[in-house]
Curated annotation (Swiss-Prot):
This is Serine/arginine repetitive matrix protein 1. It comes from Mus musculus. Residues 171-207, 274-327, 334-349, 555-572, 586-611, 640-655, 668-682, 850-875 have a biased composition (Basic residues). The modification Phosphothreonine is found at T241, T404, T414, T593, T600, T633, T736, T819, T834, T913. Keywords: Acetylation, Citrullination, DNA-binding, Isopeptide bond, mRNA processing, mRNA splicing, Nucleus, Phosphoprotein, RNA-binding, Spliceosome, Ubl conjugation. Belongs to the splicing factor SR family.
Amino acid sequence: MDAGFFRGTSAEQDNRFSNKQKKLLKQLKFAECLEKKVDMSKVNLEVIKPWITKRVTEILGFEDDVVIEFIFNQLEVKNPDSKMMQINLTGFLNGKNAREFMGELWPLLLSAQENIAGIPSAFLELKKEEIKQRQIEQEKLASLKKQDEDKDKRDKEEKESSREKRERSRSPRRRKSRSPSPRRRSSPVRRERKRSHSRSPRHRTKSRSPSPAPEKKEKSPELPEPSVRMKDSSVQEATSTSDILKAPKPEPVPEPKEPSPEKNSKKEKEKTRPRSRSRSKSRSRTRSRSPSHTRPRRRHRSRSRSYSPRRRPSPRRRPSPRRRTPPRRMPPPPRHRRSRSPGRRRRRSSASLSGSSSSSSSSRSRSPPKKPPKRTSSPPRKTRRLSPSASPPRRRHRPSSPATPPPKTRHSPTPQQSNRTRKSRVSVSPGRTSGKVTKHKGTEKRESPSPAPKPRKVELSESEEDKGSKMAAADSVQQRRQYRRQNQQSSSDSGSSSTSEDERPKRSHVKNGEVGRRRRHSPSRSASPSPRKRQKETSPRMQMGKRWQSPVTKSSRRRRSPSPPPARRRRSPSPAPPPPPPPPPPRRRRSPTPPPRRRTPSPPPRRRSPSPRRYSPPIQRRYSPSPPPKRRTASPPPPPKRRASPSPPPKRRVSHSPPPKQRSPTVTKRRSPSLSSKHRKGSSPGRSTREARSPQPNKRHSPSPRPRAPQTSSPPPVRRGASASPQGRQSPSPSTRPIRRVSRTPEPKKIKKTAMATQRNIRRVSKSPKADSLSRAASPSPQSVRRVSSSRSVSGSPEPAAKKPPAPPSPVQSQSPSTNWSPAVPAKKAKSPTPSLSPARNSDQEGGGKKKKKKKDKKHKKDKKHKKHKKHKKEKAVTIATPATAAPAAVSAATTTSAQEEPAAAPEPRKETESEAEDDNLDDLERHLREKALRSMRKAQVSPQS
């Protein structure tokens, strides 16, 4: 073809230039009508378009808008070319169809052209026919409708008449059967029962504060298994249990058992008020009614209100705990008002319960508000309450719910633990571990499960010792500390204020010896929470085992002696394993396996991290009650105190080997515990408020490291070695809560070094102590190094040097440089930490120099803290007087950071308005304290290192 073109073929011969349409016109066959021309101006195209569309659709088998519009466009021309239209349509319609289509279309156009209206005659005829048909159809339809309507009316009338007759004949029967309806009566009875349950729970929650007896009753129902616990736990859990039971009971009420339990529980409220500690009646009733229900109710109320509110909303209700914390501030006085021995137990239970969940007063006074949250938690717990078998579900539910609400558990773990401890002193240790661990497992199960068992054991020892004011006060203080730390971090202002207020008065009442015990107990609780947290955070498995161990051992050792127990408590985490076996009964209720789940739950680590810090402070408070105050003051820039407080507890661990030193430190630490506890209350609340507010995320992230570090370090040397560096890594951020603010990443490496060095140093220091004490002492040293590194990271290497970790000090120092402001505060804290370390390590290291430094720090910090904390001292005057000697170190250390932040922290909880006013002063004080702390750090570094 192309070649021909180039050869000289003509355009006609070349198909490229040929007129194809002409060829097509020649080739195609057209209808005869197409030869006629149509004037489209005379045609009503709108009438024809529907026909075209219909016809094209019939030909193509589907509606093709392109073809239809193409035809319309061609017809819009005044004189369309029919043949060209057919040629153009052959591409869309095949030749045959195109010819047929044009053969039909053109006649229509021609007829429309002739018609005046421009409508084809065919259409007119069709329309006429259609109209006729429509009329006929309409007539038919009308007649049919009339007939149908008549029939329907007749049918309806007949049906209505028959129905009326039937109804008339049946109505008397129905009315008779319905009116008597015993169902209604039974339902009203049930409703009344439910109401009585729900009301009684409400009334109980309302009457919790006035009457712990209902709580005791409910506790007594729970007592059946932990009857031993029941006395103290009945008191403590009375508040928490009454809250929980009240909230849960409305839910369990549907069960017939529940109504009777409620009635019984109401009766028991009155009876158990006198009985409150009479376990047999409450046990028999509880057991006969449903121990699982009643105890689950306790747990549910304490847990549901404390745990469930915090666990389930855990993150969410951490703020809510803050909300509750203001009421907590209010509750503490009522707790004291309510007979401190039982009241304290109740306070502990309620304080730990309501303290953990805005406990005693918040649970009591707020019990109604908490009821809904606890009720929310109680529904799952209903199942737990419903039957002992349900209690394992509770454990299971708690593991699941704890993951969410562990915060609640954090706050209430101690109280509940104390309640459970007292309730099931025999079996509660597992129950505590399982129950609290299960409950706290989400966060507090891991964090506070250990504290929970420990508090229970503490309560066991307390219940064994007194079940009375001292242990109750210690439990309440511990619980308050726990929930302070929890609330301080969750609601550090109000939580810390209420907790610090409660703890301070209790401490002032308890004072040195009792303050030491209570602090030790509370430290054991708080420490135990942190160990468990550490254990939990260290590894779910390790945490589980160690939690069980630590709670029991701690409780047993607590029983052995208030002062040694702190160290033993830390030791106890590993020794605790023997006691945990007895707790399995509580585990039965809580499902021993589920508690591990709760403990194991790695999800809670988030909560762990938040509550771990809280618990690590609680640990500090609990562990360091006697010696830790120094470390508390030393490492405890309030958050650091919590972080550093683990280091004081490590001192106990370390000082286990030198118990006498522990005791002497305990004396000083007892003094300082009140101060340190005050600082923890105030400054740690303050920082917990500050850092819990700003660093809470950090606390959750980095605190989890610390609590883990404390857990890992305190429970086993293996964890120490394995997790000590992890703790170092993680604790760097915890240890440098200030540093966390400054920088977290550098610290992990540094803290690893410090943790390793501190592990080595601690092992050296704690060579004499047992493996547990070594692991705890060694891990405490990492913890102390870490927490001290928190303070040291803040305060520099003086304390690491004191601990014989020159390498750690440098990392910590590098950390402290990262936290420039915090190093100054830690410097003083380091001073106090070095002193605090000195009691445990004075024998190992430069105790004299550190003690002198402690005295100096105490002097400086006393003046500073007295100036800064005049308000706090007024509030804490009684407690401060007791730890006045140790107070300088604890207060000075706390004053460095906590005095700086404690004015803000303690005033914030107690006097937020004052704390706001004091914040400006605190900033200046913090600057001065930081400067002095830096100076003291330098001195401490020189002397300890030398």
